[in-house]
């Protein structure tokens, strides 16, 4: 008789094979042996009056049942500049999700639903990003270029997130050591998810932009 797969047993055997060491049992020598390094990506919403790429007010949040219209979208992947499809984008596309956006007239506009081009970058947000970069000893870039990061989970109606690098190669001084900072970026926020049931995913656009 064929033996049934035992997930717990498989997990324990895999831990032994890779030489897993529990966090509480790990020593400095263990980290040095595997050459362990880790980094953190920290996100912080800025307290600005307006959103990053349009003139809608920031920080105006609606309840799930408070919306003026619904918009339905189906996301499809596109080729990158290298002529390739992003693996994550293809995975999301295969879920065949129907994306529903709940829109409030008080917090969203045609830019947020990808019907008009972006407005000029919010100067208040840019100034805050530059100030943080200076305080963190980051080198300010000579030119700010808006780039795109592809997202097909529906959290951004365009299918990509507009983002810009503001500073690079900085550091924060702690009590006993310095923490190296690779870069600081300024990017638009995504929608807030209301639900994800079956093949329908619902978002609110109040935070978007």
Segments the model singles out, each with a brief description of its role:
Residues 1-209:
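Basic, nucleic-acid-interacting segments
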């Amino acid at each position: 008789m064929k033996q049934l797969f035992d997930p717990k047993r498989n997990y324990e055997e895999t831990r032994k094979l890779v030489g897993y060491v529990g966090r509480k049992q790990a020593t400095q020598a263990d980290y040095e042996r595997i050459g362990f390094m880790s980094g953190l990506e920290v996100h912080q919403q800025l307290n600005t009056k307006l959103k990053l790429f349009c003139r809608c007010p920031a920080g105006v949040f609606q309840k799930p049942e408070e919306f003026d219209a619904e918009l339905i979208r189906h996301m499809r992947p596109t080729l990158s500049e290298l002529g390739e499809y992003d693996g994550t984008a293809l995975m999301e596309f295969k879920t065949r999700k129907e994306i529903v956006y709940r829109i409030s007239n008080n917090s969203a506009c045609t830019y947020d639903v990808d019907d008009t081009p972006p407005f000029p970058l919010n100067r208040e947000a840019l100034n805050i990003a530059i100030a943080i970069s200076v305080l963190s000893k980051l080198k300010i870039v000579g030119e700010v270029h808006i780039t795109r990061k592809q997202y097909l989970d529906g959290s951004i109606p365009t299918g990509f997130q507009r983002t810009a690098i503001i500073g690079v190669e900085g550091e924060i001084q702690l009590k006993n050591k310095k923490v190296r900072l690779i870069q600081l970026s300024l990017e638009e926020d995504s929608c807030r998810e209301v639900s994800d049931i079956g093949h329908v995913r619902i978002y609110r656009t109040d935070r978007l932009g």
